[in-house]
Amino acid sequence: MPDIVNRKVEHVEIAAFENVDGLSSSTFLNDVILVHQGFPGISFSEINTKTKFFRKEISVPVMVTGMTGGRNELGRINKIIAEVAEKFGIPMGVGSQRVAIEKAEARESFAIVRKVAPTIPIIANLGMPQLVKGYGLKEFQDAIQMIEADAIAVHLNPAQEVFQPEGEPEYQIYALEKLRDISKELSVPIIVKESGNGISMETAKLLYSYGIKNFDTSGQGGTNWIAIEMIRDIRRGNWKAESAKNFLDWGVPTAASIMEVRYSVPDSFLVGSGGIRSGLDAAKAIALGADIAGMALPVLKSAIEGKESLEQFFRKIIFELKAAMMLTGSKDVDALKKTSIVILGKLKEWAEYRGINLSIYEKVRKRE
């Protein structure tokens, strides 16, 4: 178990201080153009960014996706993020709680989140491979109760597990059967999220057939977990490092993943994440088909610098989001979902090759 705790710390250290953001991959968000409206028909002061996150109202259609926890120093980061998220009315996810379920002294680094953020939605987190390894309803309930969570994320990370020195790439189909049965017993919704390589329409349809309707794309183009594990392989002299280099651009780009999930599961609740680095990125993700946008790495980096740095980061994100809403004439989040967009370049090629009819998609993304 100390290995898991140390791994959590090493992951944060590499993510924050090594070059693992984007690299040779792309979100394809540059191929999404929000159409400028020279006369928006609204004033900046009347723009309303409030929306719903399941049963709770949130101030902005942006969430902090799960990152860390497990040791005191990681708990301090979680505390800063939670305090600032509470101040801005932004949902927050925690990192995988496996370490806290199996190691009692790690629990406080997660529990602190709800203590300092009593009102915002908090999202618990466990990994899909743990279902194969024996986790069940008891562990899910423990993770939820630990932080009084409003939802629980189940993360998919096969690419990370394949290249991780101590990885457990266990994804047998009966994990989904267990997840379906567990979901019927839980009092909070399950969100299935990827970990930097995106959700395809095949995966979305498969998950939907097992009762999953909530997704977090975590697409290619943001934090590169294959690169993080490659660095860990290099540090250990592990031969997997050479192979990992060939997979640094692996995955479904964020914009493509948003389209694939929305097109294949139109009634889903969808978090668009993976390389969201600005309020404009968030606006594009929502206009393209996400319900809210999610981000992790820039939040982590700002939190490491301190509370004031993170507050300034969120102010910047919210301003940029509102600027995009103003310039598209979108007075609220529902209007942003229906705003005019143009899809160009590689994203258009991807969509057409994958059988996404753009005329039909235009109606699907607007929820018509």
Swiss-Prot record:
Effect of Q160L: 28-fold decrease in the catalytic efficiency and 5-fold decrease in the affinity binding for IPP
SMART domains documented for this protein: IMPDH
Phenotype for E194A: Does not affect the proper folding of the enzyme, but it shows significant reduction of isomerase activity
Keywords assigned by UniProt, alphabetized: Cytoplasm, Flavoprotein, FMN, Isomerase, Isoprene biosynthesis, Magnesium, Metal-binding, NADP
Top-rank lineage group of the source organism: Archaea
Enzyme class: isomerase
Result when mutating H155A: Does not affect the proper folding of the enzyme, but it shows significant reduction of isomerase activity
Effect upon mutating D216A: Does not affect the proper folding of the enzyme, but it shows significant reduction of isomerase activity
BP GO terms, sorted: isoprenoid biosynthetic process
UniProt: Mg(2+) binding residues: E161
Protein EC: 5.3.3.2
GO CC annotations, alphabetized: cytoplasm
Subcellular location: Cytoplasm
Mutation effect (T68A): Does not affect the proper folding of the enzyme, but it shows significant reduction of isomerase activity
Residues given in the record as substrate binding sites: R7, K8, S96, Q97, R98, Q160
Catalytic activity: isopentenyl diphosphate = dimethylallyl diphosphate
Keyword Transferase: no
Substitution effect: K8A: Does not affect the proper folding of the enzyme, but it shows significant loss of isomerase activity
Effect upon mutating K193A: Shows significant loss of isomerase activity. Binds FMN with very low affinity, but the global structure of the mutant has not been altered by the mutation
Effect the entry attributes to changing Q160H: 23-fold decrease in the catalytic efficiency
GO MF: FMN binding; isopentenyl-diphosphate delta-isomerase activity; magnesium ion binding; NADPH binding; oxidoreductase activity
PANTHER family: ISOPENTENYL-DIPHOSPHATE DELTA-ISOMERASE
Family: Belongs to the IPP isomerase type 2 family.
Family matches, as HAMAP family: Idi_2 (MF_00354)
Biological function: Involved in the biosynthesis of isoprenoids. Catalyzes the 1,3-allylic rearrangement of the homoallylic substrate isopentenyl (IPP) to its allylic isomer, dimethylallyl diphosphate (DMAPP).
Name recorded for this polypeptide: Isopentenyl-diphosphate delta-isomerase
Organism: Saccharolobus shibatae (strain ATCC 51178 / DSM 5389 / JCM 8931 / NBRC 15437 / B12) (Sulfolobus shibatae)
